[in-house]
C-alpha cells in the first residue's frame, strides 16, 4: 500500500459458524473479504480495533496490510479470513475500518 489512500475492497462476508472436530460446541465469528494490493510482498489481515466500537453489539475490526518478503509491483486482489471465538448472538454486526475510514459494514 502506498500513501494514505483507502484501498479498494470487495466480497465481504461475516457469519457465526460452529466449531468442528473436538470443538463442535464452540461458536466462531468468521469475517472474510478481499483487498486490492499493488505489491507482491503485501499481506492483508484483520485485527480488533482499539478502541473498540462504542456500540457493544458491533465488533469493530481494522484492516491492516503488512509487508513480508521481496518487493515487486503487481496489482492483485488478496483474500483474507479472520476467526474469533464468540457465543451465539454476541454481535449484531461487524464494522471494518482502514485508518479510521469505514470500508465495510456487515450485518450478522
Where are these regions (language model features)?
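Exposed, flexible binding/inhibitory loops of compact, secreted disulfide-stabilized domains
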Residues: 1-108
Amino acid at each position: 500500500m502506498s500513501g494514505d489512500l483507502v484501498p479498494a475492497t470487495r466480497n465481504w462476508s461475516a457469519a457465526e459458524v460452529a466449531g468442528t472436530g473436538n470443538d463442535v460446541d464452540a461458536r466462531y465469528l468468521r469475517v472474510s473479504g478481499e483487498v486490492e494490493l499493488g505489491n507482491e510482498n503485501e499481506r492483508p489481515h484483520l485485527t480488533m480495533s482499539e478502541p473498540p466500537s462504542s456500540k457493544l453489539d458491533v465488533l469493530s475490526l481494522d484492516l491492516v496490510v503488512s509487508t513480508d518478503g521481496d518487493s515487486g509491483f503487481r496489482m492483485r486482489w488478496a483474500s483474507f479470513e479472520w476467526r474469533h471465538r464468540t457465543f451465539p448472538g454476541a454481535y449484531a454486526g461487524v464494522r471494518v475500518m482502514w485508518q479510521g475510514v469505514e470500508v465495510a459494514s456487515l450485518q450478522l
